[in-house]
A protein has these predicted regions:
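Compositionally biased terminal segments of proteins
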Residues: 1-259
Length: 259
């Protein structure tokens, strides 16, 4: 039996879904990346020009799945208590050609703690949509890296392009925060990105695909913190570079032993 093809949500679909969801769930995954990319005016690569992702993912409960399904007139499904799934619900709509549009409601995202994702999510008031909770940009980057590291099905051209796009998006976000809220706030974001870059999964993904979270730091925009340039940043790059070299050698040794 052939698995049904996933249909891409149209911009109108996404706007309607976000408006219905309001702030009841947290927008995560590829649609969170797409939201921030558009909000910050980041250029999409050719691979993601038509759509960053096909579906929409939210951290939310079964009541939200029911609400979305009924409001959209789409089918909705809620798992049984004994179903082994991270989904709390799913909303689908089958098109005439058999392809399926879908929304996933999740208890969490791989590699990140749900409580932290909810705590760091940013509340927005979006024109033509209304109130919305969106996954923090750095969590978006972190989740794209975890997907590439932990989910073989994500290691494709689109998944790699999402990782690179998330890096550019976070760079734009930090530049915006620098300009609007100052270096003290932006420095905390820099330190969080540095922590992401030092994670073993991020080190592996850098070695495999060249996706470098440190490229998300607009270092030249930090103009008043001399200690950052003379002390902190050299320490960060030295530490991350050492971890990358250590893992590179481990990978090379493992390959040699398999020969």
């Amino acid at each position: 039996m052939t698995e049904a093809r996933e249909a891409v949500l149209s911009p109108t679909d996404v706007k309607t879904i976000l408006g219905l969801c309001s702030a009841e769930g947290v927008l995560v995954g590829g649609q969170a990346l797409a939201f921030w990319v558009d909000h910050l005016g980041v250029r999409r690569p050719q691979e993601l020009e038509i759509a960053v992702t096909a579906d929409a993912d939210f951290i939310g409960d079964s009541a939200l799945a029911k609400k979305l399904g009924e409001a959209l007139g789409w089918k909705w499904w809620i798992p049984n208590l004994d179903d082994a799934t991270p989904q709390t619900g799913k909303v689908t709509h089958t098109l005439a050609d058999g392809s399926i549009k879908q929304i996933d409601l999740l208890s969490g995202v791989i590699g990140l703690t749900t409580l932290d994702v909810k705590r760091r999510a940013i509340d927005m008031d979006v024109p033509e949509i209304g109130p919305l909770r969106v996954m923090h940009p750095i969590d978006v980057l972190d989740s794209r890296i975890h997907n590439l590291d932990l989910l073989p099905g994500k290691r494709n051209a689109a998944g790699i392009a999402q990782g690179a796009l998330a890096t550019a998006m976070v760079r734009a976000f930090i530049s915006h925060e620098l300009e609007s809220r100052g270096e003290r706030v932006a420095l905390k974001l820099l330190e969080r990105v540095a922590a992401v870059a030092a994670e073993p999964g991020a080190v592996r993904i850098f070695l495999l695909y060249g996706i470098d979270p440190l490229n998300a730091i607009p270092l030249e925009d930090f103009r008043t913190n001399a200690a950052l340039h003379t002390k902190l940043w050299p320490q960060i790059t030295e530490r991350v570079s050492a971890q990358r070299e250590k893992m590179r050698r481990l990978i090379q040794t493992a390959k040699s032993r398999r020969k």
